[in-house]
């Protein structure tokens, strides 16, 4: 894991990337996650998607940069795993609300 100074819910998200139940505690109850155009609304949908993605891709994310982008935190991440094009750089846009992730958008 990198030594970036990530806000707590973002750091917790990356620390628990292979533990969907723990990841669910990083999100607000009505959080929305978008992964390459696919939308997941609510904790149960997010948890199910993350469990499936973890099992399928065995991805490991290494945050390498963070910056403010409007009302979001943009984290640039190097991701390796069992998928075509690995390793690759992805952008994770987090919008935080009351110390939890309210929205997360993952794009190339």
Annotate each predicted stretch with a short phrase.
Residues 1-108:
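C-terminal and inter-domain tail/linker signature
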